[in-house]
Amino acid sequence: MYESYTGHPYDRPMTNEALQRATKLLDAVILADGHNDLPWELRQHGGPNPVEAAASLDLTVRQPALHTDFPKLADGKLGMQFWSVYVPCEFEGHSAVTAVLEQVEVVHQLVERYPDRLRLVTTADEAEAAFADGRIASLLGAEGGHSIAESIGVLRILRRLGVRYMTLTHNFNTTWADAGTDEPAHGGLTEFGRDVVREMNKIGMMVDLSHVAPSTMRAAIEVSSVPVIFSHSSCTAVNDHPRNIPDDVLAKLPGNGGVAMITFVPAFVSPKVAAWNEQLEAAMAEAGQEYRNLTLRGKFVQDWDGPPKPLATVEDVVAHVEHAREVAGIDHIGLGGDYDGVGSLPEGLEDTSKYPVLFAALLERGWSEDDCAKLAGRNTLRVLREVDGFAR
């Protein structure tokens, strides 16, 4: 089980042995992150036009307003990123389809704008080649099944455009799948929801079970013929939050072959932050506002006179990583930071430059470099290959 540190590894000098080992390791192996919301953050700066969004901020210099830019990514040793083509649940039907296509184009624009930094890839082999050439292998992940507007045709189009996974829900239920942060409506997946999972298997699109209800997780794993992923979730047993993964589901991953990519979101990893968020949710409900609407939540908290928000730490994230390893096994874990998808990240993991700090902490706790390499990206690449092998 997880034991507390006697100190904070992120406060130690950058020259410490563990951090040097972590940096050297991440120079040699692909570090893959399952979820980054930079495309939507750029839309917030530049508007819905993908060209203007991609050009709204110069990512070659440090951007204090962002968790992600190329100097930070270089320091963080990131080798492979699933860029989220996220669409808020407020978009429905045709507007959701339009928005997700715009977000796909934002990523394409970024790759064209920064060809010396990014390379658009769709396979594990292409990702490894991009890494060898000094580029960040860039893949796309759709967040929220509402973005296909109940159309298998739209799902197939997204895959044709390079989208490699789809999160079955976001914060609200779809008409065919239950979300973890909504009231149960379907008992997990409807028959159409099961058809969506089967079609994703067929076309080589990974089934992402972050955000969904445990009943949906179990149903999707039962239906899926290939490994599933959780692109950015943590462990319910460590912090009982509806966005996390119960132990019985983690225990299914060795049989399924899937990967739980542990996230850094403070409310998901820290019980103290989760309790603070419950107070915020209650205050918003009293004011007649919807907590699950991320835009409304951000505005509300600016003027809220509630208690100060507690801080999550690297130690909190380590607790989830080690619990997932204990229950699912070392071959079934990865990382999905959710950078630029939340306002702040834990101390020591504040932005995308900080990945080596996490690996230094794990090395200090006795992790082998081989196990760190599996967590970093080897497991995720295996799943990508298995999904593609079934589709072919």
What is each residue range found by the language model?
Residues 197-199, 208, 285:
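Membrane-embedded translocation segments of transport machinery
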